[in-house]
Amino acid sequence: MPITDTIIYNRSGLFSQRAQTSLGWIRAISDGQHLTYLDWNQTGWTNHDQPDDVSRETITQLTAYFHGDLRRFDLPLLPAGMSQSRRRWLDVMTTIPFGTTISYAAFAAAAGHPRAARAAGTACATNPIPIIYPCHRVLRGDGQLGNYSGGSHLLPTHQDNLQ
C-alpha cells in the first residue's frame, strides 16, 4: 500500500504510533518517509504519539498480520543505525517464507556467507524492525530460540502469532 509523501516533521524529525497487540504494546517509529524502528520497550515511552502516514500504516499492517489477514508487509523500510551491508542481512530475512523457520547456518548460506552463522545470529539479535524483518523465523541449529531482538521472552507464549 503506498504511503503519501506529504509529511510535516515534528521537532525531533521522528514520528511514532503505538498500539496494543497480541504481543503487548508495540511502537512504530518513522523518519517521515520510512519505518526505522519497532519497539516493545515501554520504559521511556514518556512522549505522546506523533503519528505520520508511515507509522499509522505500520500499525495497520501489524494488526492485520496478528489477525492472520496479512502474510507479507509492504512498508518503506530504513532500519535505524544499519550500514548497507547489515541491511543486506535483513533483506535476506524477508525471503524466509511465512510459516517456516530456518537455522542460523541456513540463513548465513542464503545470505551468501555459509560459514557465518554467528554473523547471522548477530543480524537477528540487532534487528531494529523485528516482525517486519522476520528474525523470529531464524532458529539455532537445535531448533531452539536464539537471541531474538524483540525479546526471546515474547516468543514461547506468542509463537502462533509470529509465523
Q: Could you describe each region identified by the protein language model?
A:
Residues 1-114, 163:
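Basic nucleic-acid-binding alpha-helical/helix-turn surface characteristic of O6-alkylguanine DNA
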Residues 148-163:
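Positively charged, aromatic-accented nucleic-acid-binding surfaces
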Residues 131-138:
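Short Lys/Arg-enriched helix C-cap and helix-to-coil transition segments
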Residues 140-143, 149:
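Short helix-start
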Residues 59, 124, 152:
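Short amphipathic alpha-helical/adjacent loop interface patches that line ligand
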Residues 115-130:
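Regulatory, non-catalytic segments
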